Each structure stands twice: as C-alpha cells, then as structure tokens.
Amino acid sequence: MATTVPQKSAFDIAGKYQVYLTWCELGACLFSVVSTALSFFEFYAYIENSVTMISVAFLIAICFFQMRFRSTYREAESVRRDGLIDHCFGTIMADTQSEGYYDSVDIDSGFKKLLASIHESSLLSSVIVDGMLKRQERLTFIGGIFVVIACIARSIQSELLLAILNGFLSLRLLDDYCELHALRTEIRNVLEKCKHICEDRANSRRKTFSAQQQAHLIRECIRYECALAYASIMLDEDLYQQLNPTHEKAWKAIKERYYD
C-alpha cells in the first residue's frame, strides 16, 4: 500500500519560500541596525545611496516572498484538507499520486477517523505552536527594540524611506507574534472541544455518532482548518522532530482510552 502524502510536494515548495522570506527578514533587520550605526560616521555620506537601494531591495524581496509563500501554502493546505477527507471516508479528492493510500470505510467509521485525526493534529499542533510562540516572543522583544531604535534614529536624520522600512520590519515582527498567539488560542479551543466530544461519546450508550456529535465534529474540523489557513504559518519541522516522541506517548494514552 502506497504511503505517499499528496500535499508533501506542495508543502515543500511553500517551505522553500518561507525559508527565503525568513532570511530576507533577518537580513533586513541586521542590515537596518548596522546601517543605522554607520550613519553616525562621516564616511556614511559616501554609501548613503547604496544603503537606500539595498533597503528598497530588501523591502521588495520581503513582499514578494511573503506573497509567494502565502499563495503556495494555501494551495498546499487545500490539498491536505482533501487528503484528510479521503483518508477518513475513502474518497478520492486529493492528488492521484496517493492512489492506494485510502481505505473504504462506512460513514460512522469515517467520522471516528476524522475525530481522531483532528484530535491528534490539534494535540501536536498546540505543543509545536507553543514552542514557536516562545521563540517568537524573544525575537519580537529583542529584534523589535533594535528596529524601533533604528526607526527613530532614521526619522531624526530625516531619512524617511529608511524609517518606513524599519517601521515595516517592526510591524512584521509584531504581526508574526500576534498570528502565532491567535493560532495557539484557536487550536487549544479545538483540542478542548475534541476532548469534550470524546467524553460525550464515552458516556453515551450509542455506538454511533449522533447528529449533534457529527455537527460538533464538523464544526471543530472547520475551525481547525480555518485557523491554519488564515494564519498561513507552517509548523516548525525541527520542533516537530523534537516533540514527536513525547507526543506519541501522550496520543497513545488518549487513543487507548477513546478510540481503540
């Protein structure tokens, strides 16, 4: 049986653009701080035009790679959503390179697999996003201070274009933090609702999903998918590799309690 994940190639492309975007943002922040420090020396007058041109190039590159990352990421997310439904209900909506990957199951079994998929995904995602948020907090605080100082210095020196660039970079850092914070909150809410559905099923005499349980599950599935799509944030692969062993132990306990 093939195990190819249909969205992998699409996420690989989005991941490349995210790397380019990250390096451009870090390079722009570093260049901004260094050029601001150099602006207090006399020889800066000879390189001022070059600094302006490089700053504009960074700004254009950041906007371009952000646009490309978001478009390719949303395309990959669309394929992944179709793949999730295929996996749970035995349909063929996603890329045909996963032919043979999906099993034919009845509707109730499909809902159970869908609940397990969203439950497991939200459990792992909440831990990864929490780690990403802590790292972003440090970056926003430290990087934001230097960039804001550079922005003020450029404003005092009447270098409006460079001041705008520094202001843009500081807003980018703050926006990334706010997006991660909102994503963590939404994923935690989904995780709690999945636990509630599991408890409700465990306490029910019904062996199948009730209409209300189906509606709640579909709502949480939509909330989880929309949270990922709107945030346009790829979960950190290094954190995934680091946290996955612990996650597998936690998920095994949950699976044995509610799904086996």
Enumerate the predicted regions with their spans.
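Conserved non-transmembrane functional hotspots
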Residues: T3-Q18, S71-K134, E186, V190-D260
